[in-house]
């Protein structure tokens, strides 16, 4: 009985790759230094899987930035602005595409399906000359082979690559990307040929777009692609891997009939309906890679339940064709529990990170083969039972309060236009008010202070003094820049979710539970293991302190319930919406306390609202209903003069704009600059929006400093579709990851651009 891993985290157990990348970008280390760290990480991952007994070990799931970018470089799909002259793509071109450079902007980055990982969006069109320009997949296969590990090279499948791309600038928006299939398949054939020549016997194509609602012509592209590749794939075993959701019934038929394919991988954690499809019929003689171990969460698998599922499949697939696998790449979970010595022992017994999931996969495969490790299974059963019965999981008062929310509407009593009038009388803001999204750069000194306070190396008084000094600097800087609505910069916060989770009951935290978000950026999601409540105020002291330093409005800064939910590892023993309602009630208590403390502008970030949207349209309405309801719960009951802002990230909002309007926030700021004003098209199409809105005027994910003219041009584009009296001027996102040398001139240019347009508007009257 065989075992398989879809993919594995790249960053390393202690984020070794992150630090190596950032050192290289800062010119503190060489390309060779970076390559050495990467090679050591790959080697240790392959060895770890081989030692654990995994039969089908993946290669080419490592990346210096992103696997879709790797595929674009493999195909030589480099936008002209990066001046790629042909040959093998090196770090300069690769990282310019990912991050931009002094003279050209980065490519767009967007969410990878409904996860918190981001991929670089390929820019394609009829003029792209595809060529085999990165031999990474073959090189990594050979590298593993030299170490004595025979791996399964993994490629993003050709159809998924095209479906995740976008038409390049200057190409018609309606350009049929799938028409490029004939142009990219010759490159795939070259790669496959080289892998075969190097000795590969298996190859994995990741085609996760198969779980989406696809149109018939899109489905036909899969049939066409694999028919075209069939002769090249001859002599290889081929896995087509899917993940993140159920496979639609029609898609299942097409997928399981693909030519040249030996095995199919399915997510059986999020795909219970797929299980029914398999039981209804599976192609004879094909392998089933059964994704029963959850790759997206940190809970130990219920091994008895997984084994039962696998046993039910044995009769359908055949014992020798059933392979135990993860539900998706382990990229989306933390790396190794061994690095968590301080985690509460009981909670720790309920968990499994990537390294432990590899062991679970192998234990299930051995159990199926009649070599069940009884002690391992008993220990797992005891942990499952302890989690079900632990008193720390349940709080009856919280359960009751959350249950009472169902079915009610919870909406502020007056309309948004009436509230905006009342707020303007109180705040007296200029036309095109300027603000920032919340965080300011976190210097090494600031991080040191927080670290030492956490380690009890400095006193609380010293810590408070240091944070107050930092807030004072940030307030002073914003006043000097003449920003209208200020923020305190969040110097006390390590992370916008962890900071709140640390002060809420029902949350646990890891020391090294890092997960890659994009590039070198990692997040450390909290673990929601029990019912959530707020024992004490969380932000009031710092917001009040900051407001006392200025006469200008100071925003209270909170993270919204849906974002806390979507950016945490969430308990899987109750529906997600129940946990979300509990968090909403905790945030509501905080909002009320901020208002009482004299904070007139409160931002409740819902950066991840869109990200939680189920992949299939049939499930959208239910999710949006409870997600939007949860947000509205947080700001009831407030005075009309209290202005509620919300902020959203990386999102294509056009399909959910009516739900966003239904959130009933007074002002919404949205990341917009990297998506070439995609958001504005919604308003061009006549959607009426009466609340304040601030589409980001510059990209904070790039070190590039935009000019006043560039920002003014962006504002003018916005004014072409939005009323002057509702438009706000702000960056895309928080400034935490940037340096002050980048932030000061960028904000200076932003304020200058707003003033320039104000003057033009005044003289045009």
Swiss-Prot record:
Active site: 701 (proton donor)
Positions with a binding annotation for Zn(2+) 2: 658, 662
Origin: domain of life: Eukaryota
Top enzyme category: transferase
GO cellular component terms given for this protein: cytoplasm
Residues noted as binding L-methionine in the record, renumbered to the chain: 437-439, 490, 605
SUPFAM superfamilies for this protein: UROD/MetE-like
Annotated residues for binding of 5-methyltetrahydropteroyltri-L-glutamate: 18, 116, 495, 518, 521-522, 567
Protein location: Cytoplasm
Catalytic activities: 5-methyltetrahydropteroyltri-L-glutamate + L-homocysteine = tetrahydropteroyltri-L-glutamate + L-methionine
Keyword Cytoplasm: yes
Amino acids binding L-homocysteine: 437-439, 490, 605
Binding site for Zn(2+) 1: 647, 649, 671, 733
Example GO BP: methionine biosynthetic process
Cofactor(s) named in the record: Zn(2+)
Pathway(s) it belongs to: Amino-acid biosynthesis; L-methionine biosynthesis via de novo pathway; L-methionine from L-homocysteine (MetE route): step 1/1
Extra facts: Has an absolute requirement for a polyglutamylated folate as substrate.
HAMAP family: Meth_synth (MF_00172)
Protein family: Belongs to the vitamin-B12 independent methionine synthase family.
The protein's name: 5-methyltetrahydropteroyltriglutamate--homocysteine methyltransferase
Organism encoding this protein: Catharanthus roseus (Madagascar periwinkle)
